[in-house]
């Protein structure tokens, strides 16, 4: 703080001195417009042309170049006080880099997880039963009901189908614990040929026996049955762990495609009972399309509720594999690090990391295909590319890479390295020359055998690998030593350059520290360390240059660098303005230093010389002074630049475009599921097109949800009693709904409506007849009950003989009529008595039977009177007998 105040006092004194000198001793060489002090310098307004003898302020205003190449920033640096010091580092100890990365070239095959399903062919056997009810009334028939179902075909009939290509028109099936039979067209059983169906896809082919699904008659109802025997060739899919498989029909079968009864290991998954599954050895299948019989194979048959399915028996280890080959890499490099291997695949722009211990592939389930596939791929690459230049080193090694990739790696070694190691081994063993050649030739013959797939180390594979690895290690150590020597030499060069820096700080500490710090600083030596102070950036509008470099008052002395007056910036970042808000108005005398640096004070002077010509850098351009007087401003582009840099001829990294790598293609992802959606939809569409008379059945809501909600309300509100009440409500509601549904279904039938109409007409007729009978009974009961007993009204009376007989004869005639009437009445009463007696006997028999049953349950003895009760005759019968 004290040094800073001292600087301020000196600046005020210099300001007063300059004002006095300018007023009294102004040089005559200055122009009238400048008045001894140039205006504000703005290099951006300078021009590149030579304008001759003009004032400094006019030259500054001529413009700046369009593309500056020099930094247009000016800094004012004060003398360091020692508050901030720095020291140069001491020489370092140069470490020898003896170790290097171990790399091995070879061939790699990368495996990935196999997500594709296992696809195999199956044959579906079933009979399609359609029961159709039609109604016709001298018009087009209408379908009133239709029932469709599928039933499986038994094994014995399947054998006949595969042998002769014919199927029976009879279907026997079991439903609801009962056996049923259905016949095609309701006719006797017969053999029908299986013909190809016109509707088929790429994944399914069907053969059937009939196309008819309905038959009708001209009048009335008819229920007919059609039995279509169907055989379909389909593709089935199963995914790991292969516990079930699905077909293009949309059906799934809950059994493993590799299921077998005869196995010593654990049995595969199955939810079916053993009697449903059959294994037939040496079974021959007929191709219904070509008629050819296939070679005999082991065949599996499974009977489901709706179909019978057959497929060839397969070995699981030979048919499926949990890994699949992804890519083959002819040029792979294995880089060894401390705890891992890095497999670099340059062509694929990928690197896989793995542990150093080889992976035991026998640990994987269903991965027996990997060694075979890897060996075939590596043998092919080696035969095409490396058979004449390299030999194999050891067997194929497997490593489990990051991300779930299995890497099969085959190490390679060039013939030159092998021969070089053999010669080195011969010299170390001190063998005779002739013997060396014979043994070397024998080793090469025994270790390197030529075959159709190329050279291969067989007899001494492990020893040869050890020797070749040793030779490779020797070469690798030599390369690593060379790189280590380069690094050590670079370190020593830096230590020697450090000594040069120590000497340069004694000559020009400012330039040295500015170069090291990367920004303008002021520095001076304080013994063995350097005091450093930060330079403050001065805005170019706060700088005013003088045209003359001559010292006022002494014509023989001149300034070695241009003189100027500047002011510190008033911005908050300025250290000068932070101490006093009035210091930014203070004009400070200084000189233009090197590299756009402003030196405080005017201490750089020299005796004036003749033919003086100097260029000084200010901002982006140079100021030209001749005879210590400003002439013009020169653009930096007008001065030829001499570069001190030596270009390093190094090849930069080439552009490398990273491309997306698809581990699984879209086709593979589409085939991951057990069922293929496209195939299922296509099959369902084909299936619906076979039967064009099936309409959508719409069933209305019967109100079950409302009654169920009422029952739940009772159960939640009243507890157990509510549950019981809810059960009663649901039962009653179900009964009512069933009754109403039955009545509605009955009324919706045309036959029911016709029957009801006939019944109504008959009832009306019977009612009219009954009404007439009752009215006749009320008006003339004797005539109704005893027809003929009384002559009907309007009958002429019998002619009387009283006109021609005496009175006695007339009385005899009337008595005879009464006797006849009484006889008829007695006969009617006798008939009534017989009917009544007969009814009593029937009633007595029923009463006796009921009493016997009660006595039987009560163990009460029966009596003869109870068994045969006496009949009581009416009184009028006894009187008639007495008469």
Swiss-Prot record:
<feature type="region of interest" description="Involved in fusion and/or binding to host membrane">
    <location>
        <begin position="216"/>
        <end position="223"/>
    </location>
</feature>
<feature type="glycosylation site" description="N-linked (GlcNAc...) asparagine; by host">
    <location>
        <position position="102"/>
    </location>
</feature>
<dbReference type="GO" id="GO:0044178">
    <property type="term" value="C:host cell Golgi membrane"/>
</dbReference>
<keyword id="KW-0472">Membrane</keyword>
<keyword id="KW-1015">Disulfide bond</keyword>
<dbReference type="InterPro" id="IPR035381">
    <property type="entry name" value="Glycoprot_B_PH2"/>
</dbReference>
<comment type="similarity">
    <text>Belongs to the herpesviridae glycoprotein B family.</text>
</comment>
<dbReference type="InterPro" id="IPR055341">
    <property type="entry name" value="Glycoprotein_B_ecto_C"/>
</dbReference>
<feature type="disulfide bond">
    <location>
        <begin position="167"/>
        <end position="229"/>
    </location>
</feature>
<keyword id="KW-0325">Glycoprotein</keyword>
<dbReference type="Pfam" id="PF00606">
    <property type="entry name" value="Glycoprotein_B"/>
</dbReference>
<keyword id="KW-0732">Signal</keyword>
<feature type="short sequence motif" description="Internalization motif">
    <location>
        <begin position="868"/>
        <end position="871"/>
    </location>
</feature>
<dbReference type="GO" id="GO:0019031">
    <property type="term" value="C:viral envelope"/>
</dbReference>
<feature type="site" description="Cleavage; by host furin">
    <location>
        <begin position="438"/>
        <end position="439"/>
    </location>
</feature>
<feature type="region of interest" description="Hydrophobic membrane proximal region">
    <location>
        <begin position="694"/>
        <end position="748"/>
    </location>
</feature>
<keyword id="KW-1160">Virus entry into host cell</keyword>
<feature type="glycosylation site" description="N-linked (GlcNAc...) asparagine; by host">
    <location>
        <position position="579"/>
    </location>
</feature>
<feature type="compositionally biased region" description="Acidic residues">
    <location>
        <begin position="806"/>
        <end position="817"/>
    </location>
</feature>
<feature type="glycosylation site" description="N-linked (GlcNAc...) asparagine; by host">
    <location>
        <position position="649"/>
    </location>
</feature>
<keyword id="KW-1161">Viral attachment to host cell</keyword>
<feature type="disulfide bond">
    <location>
        <begin position="94"/>
        <end position="491"/>
    </location>
</feature>
<feature type="transmembrane region" description="Helical">
    <location>
        <begin position="751"/>
        <end position="771"/>
    </location>
</feature>
<feature type="topological domain" description="Virion surface">
    <location>
        <begin position="32"/>
        <end position="750"/>
    </location>
</feature>
<feature type="glycosylation site" description="N-linked (GlcNAc...) asparagine; by host">
    <location>
        <position position="211"/>
    </location>
</feature>
<feature type="disulfide bond">
    <location>
        <begin position="77"/>
        <end position="535"/>
    </location>
</feature>
<dbReference type="InterPro" id="IPR035377">
    <property type="entry name" value="Glycoprot_B_PH1"/>
</dbReference>
<dbReference type="GO" id="GO:0019062">
    <property type="term" value="P:virion attachment to host cell"/>
</dbReference>
<dbReference type="GO" id="GO:0044175">
    <property type="term" value="C:host cell endosome membrane"/>
</dbReference>
<dbReference type="InterPro" id="IPR038631">
    <property type="entry name" value="Glycoprot_B_PH2_sf"/>
</dbReference>
<feature type="topological domain" description="Intravirion">
    <location>
        <begin position="772"/>
        <end position="883"/>
    </location>
</feature>
<dbReference type="Pfam" id="PF17417">
    <property type="entry name" value="Glycoprot_B_PH2"/>
</dbReference>
<keyword id="KW-0812">Transmembrane</keyword>
<feature type="glycosylation site" description="N-linked (GlcNAc...) asparagine; by host">
    <location>
        <position position="635"/>
    </location>
</feature>
<keyword id="KW-1039">Host endosome</keyword>
<keyword id="KW-1133">Transmembrane helix</keyword>
<feature type="region of interest" description="Hydrophobic membrane proximal region">
    <location>
        <begin position="724"/>
        <end position="744"/>
    </location>
</feature>
<keyword id="KW-1040">Host Golgi apparatus</keyword>
<keyword id="KW-1043">Host membrane</keyword>
<dbReference type="GO" id="GO:0055036">
    <property type="term" value="C:virion membrane"/>
</dbReference>
<comment type="function">
    <text>Envelope glycoprotein that forms spikes at the surface of virion envelope. Essential for the initial attachment to heparan sulfate moieties of the host cell surface proteoglycans. Involved in fusion of viral and cellular membranes leading to virus entry into the host cell. Following initial binding to its host receptors, membrane fusion is mediated by the fusion machinery composed at least of gB and the heterodimer gH/gL. May be involved in the fusion between the virion envelope and the outer nuclear membrane during virion egress.</text>
</comment>
<dbReference type="GO" id="GO:0016020">
    <property type="term" value="C:membrane"/>
</dbReference>
């Amino acid at each position: 703080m004290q040094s800073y105040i001292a600087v301020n006092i000196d600046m005020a004194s210099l300001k007063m001195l300059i004002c006095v000198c300018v007023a009294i001793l102004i040089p005559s060489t200055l122009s009238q417009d400048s008045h001894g002090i140039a205006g504000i310098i703005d290099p951006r307004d300078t021009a590149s042309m030579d304008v001759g003898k003009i004032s400094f302020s006019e030259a500054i205003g001529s413009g700046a170049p369009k593309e500056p190449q020099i930094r247009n920033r000016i800094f004012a640096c004060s003398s360091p006080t020692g508050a901030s010091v720095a020291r140069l580092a001491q020489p370092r100890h140069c470490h020898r880099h003896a170790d290097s990365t171990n790399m091995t070239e070879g061939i790699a095959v990368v495996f990935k997880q196999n997500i594709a399903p296992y696809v195999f062919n199956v044959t579906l056997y079933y009979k399609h039963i359609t029961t159709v009810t039609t109604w016709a009334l001298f018009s087009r028939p209408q379908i009133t009901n239709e029932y469709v179902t599928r039933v499986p075909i038994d094994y014995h009939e399947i054998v006949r189908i595969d042998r002769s290509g014919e199927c029976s028109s009879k279907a026997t099936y079991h439903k609801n614990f009962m056996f049923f039979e259905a016949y095609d067209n309701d006719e006797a059983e017969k053999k029908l040929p299986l013909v190809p169906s016109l509707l088929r896809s790429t994944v399914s082919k069907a053969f059937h026996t009939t196309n008819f699904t309905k038959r009708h008659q001209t009048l009335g109802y008819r229920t007919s049955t059609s039995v279509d025997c169907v055989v379909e060739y389909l593709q089935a899919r199963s995914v790991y762990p292969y516990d079930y498989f699905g077909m293009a029909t949309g059906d799934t079968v809950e059994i493993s495609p590799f299921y077998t009864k005869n196995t010593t290991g654990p049995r595969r998954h199955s939810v079916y009972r053993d009697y449903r599954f059959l294994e037939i050895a040496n079974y021959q299948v007929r191709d219904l399309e070509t008629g050819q019989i296939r070679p005999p194979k082991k065949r599996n048959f499974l009977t489901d509720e709706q179909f019978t399915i057959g497929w060839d028996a397969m070995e699981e280890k030979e048919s499926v594999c949990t890994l699949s080959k992804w890519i083959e890499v002819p040029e792979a490099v294995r880089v060894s690090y401390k705890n891992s291997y890095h497999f670099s695949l340059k062509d694929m722009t990928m690197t896989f990391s793995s542990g150093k211990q080889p992976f035991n592939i026998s640990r994987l389930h269903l991965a027996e295909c990997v060694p075979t596939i890897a060996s075939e791929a590596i043998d092919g690459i080696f035969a095409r590319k490396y058979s004449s230049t390299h030999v194999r080193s050891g067997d194929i090694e497997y490593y489990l890479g990051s991300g779930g990739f299995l890497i099969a790696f085959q190490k390679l070694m060039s013939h030159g390295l092998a021969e070089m190691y053999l010669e080195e081994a011969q010299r170390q063993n001190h063998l005779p020359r002739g013997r060396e050649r014979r043994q070397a030739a024998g080793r090469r013959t025994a270790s390197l055998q030529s075959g159709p797939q190329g050279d291969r180390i067989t007899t001494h594979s492990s020893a040869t690998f050890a020797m070749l690895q040793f030779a490779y290690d020797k070469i690798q150590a030599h390369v690593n030593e060379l790189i280590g020597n380069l690094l050590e030499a670079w370190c020593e060069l830096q230590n020697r350059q450090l000594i040069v820096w120590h000497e340069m700080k004694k000559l020009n500490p400012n330039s040295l520290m500015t170069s090291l710090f990367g920004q303008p600083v002021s520095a001076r030596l304080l013994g063995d360390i350097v005091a450093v102070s930060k330079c403050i950036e001065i805005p170019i509008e706060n700088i005013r240059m003088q045209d003359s470099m001559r010292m006022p008052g002494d014509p023989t002395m001149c300034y070695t660098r241009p003189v100027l007056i500047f002011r510190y910036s008033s911005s908050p970042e300025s250290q000068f303005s932070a101490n006093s808000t009035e210091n930014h108005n203070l004009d400070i005398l200084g000189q233009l230093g090197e590299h756009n640096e402003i030196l405080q004070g005017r201490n750089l002077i020299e005796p004036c010389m003749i033919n003086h010509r100097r260029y000084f850098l200010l901002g982006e351009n140079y100021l030209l002074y001749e005879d210590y007087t400003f002439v013009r401003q020169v653009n930096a582009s007008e001065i030829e630049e001499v570069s001190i840099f030596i270009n390093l001829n190094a090849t930069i990294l080439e552009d490398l475009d990273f491309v997306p790598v698809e581990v699984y293609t879209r086709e593979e992802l589409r085939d991951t599921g057990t069922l293929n959606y496209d195939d299922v939809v296509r099959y369902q569409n084909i299936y619906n097109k076979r039967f064009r008379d099936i309409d959508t059945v719409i069933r209305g809501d019967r109100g079950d949800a409302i009654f169920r909600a009422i029952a739940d309300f009772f159960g939640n509100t009243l507890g157990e009693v509510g549950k019981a009440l809810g059960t009663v409500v649901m039962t009653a509601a179900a009964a009512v709904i069933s009754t109403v549904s039955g009545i509605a279904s009955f009324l919706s039938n045309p036959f029911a409506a016709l029957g009801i109409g006939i019944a109504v007409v008959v009832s009306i007729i019977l009612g009219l007849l009954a009404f007439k009978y009752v009215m006749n009974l009320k008006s003339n009961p004797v005539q109704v009950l005893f027809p003929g007993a009384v002559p009907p009204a309007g009958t002429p009376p019998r002619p009387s003989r009283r006109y021609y007989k005496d009175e006695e004869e007339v009385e005899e005639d009337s008595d005879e009529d009464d006797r006849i009437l009484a006889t008829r009445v007695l006969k009617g009463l006798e008939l009534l008595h017989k009917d009544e007696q007969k009814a009593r006997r029937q009633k007595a028999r029923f009463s006796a039977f009921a009493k016997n049953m009660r006595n039987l349950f009560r163990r009460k003895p029966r009596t003869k009177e109870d068994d045969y009760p006496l009949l009581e005759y009416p009184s009028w019968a006894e009187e008639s007998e007495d008469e």
